[in-house]
Amino acid sequence: MSMQIIDPHVHFFNLVEGQYTWLQGENPPAWPNLEKIKKPISAEQLVGSTDFELTGIVHIEAGFDNQSPINELNWLSSHLKNLPFKAVSYNQIDSPTDQFKSALNAQTHPSLCGIRDITEGTDAKRLLSANSFKNLAVLSNNQLHFEAQFNIENSDITKQVAYYAKQLPQLQIIINHAGLPSDLATWQQGV
């Protein structure tokens, strides 16, 4: 019998129904495997691609429809009928709190377990906003986690996220992509 696992960071893409402006727009990333990312994959193909027994996944948003993120959650429900899953959706972390709450309420779905807002590079400064702290408290109060995607080498942002974690001890914060390391020594200091 193979080892049972839950894959905690999976992206399914539906380039027909989804928007993915970062992937299909005028300036897609210059990644070497971009065409593989664009290829549609079924849950069955994912399960069959590993020697592990995949008992569940956590799907992380990737820009399906950031104006109406519930559309991605609904699509996932139809696409992943035979695989237990939870989903992390999009919500702008530094938006006014009433707007953040309204957007969160519009995403009510049994699979929703957290929120991600990509704050890489200069976007990281949005994590310094007072609204970010208020909205993280909303997530904590709703038992939803925050998927933080920022360069951990940015010490000001890393210190701020650590401060939030201390102030909101019930909030789960997950650092995406290992904090996007580019300089190992600086990254280690950030960790």
Language-model features: locations:
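Short, acidic/polar
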Residues: 40-49, 68-76, 95-107, 130-132, ...
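Acidic-and-aromatic substrate-binding clefts and catalytic sites of carbohydrate-active enzymes
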Residues: 63-70, 91-99, 122-128, 151-158, ...
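Short loop/turn motifs at secondary-structure junctions
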Residues: 53, 83, 108-111, 169
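Hydrophobic alpha-helical segments and helix pairs
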Residues: 95-147
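An N-terminally biased module of ancient metal coordination in phosphate/nucleic-acid-related enzymes
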Residues: 1-82
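N-terminal cationic-hydrophobic initiation segments that often serve targeting/anchoring roles
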Residues: 77-80, 108, 165-166
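Hydrophobic faces of well-ordered beta-strands that scaffold small-molecule active sites
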Residues: 6-10, 56-60, 85-89, 113-117, ...
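Catalytic pocket-lining loop regions of alpha/beta-barrel enzymes
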Residues: 128-191
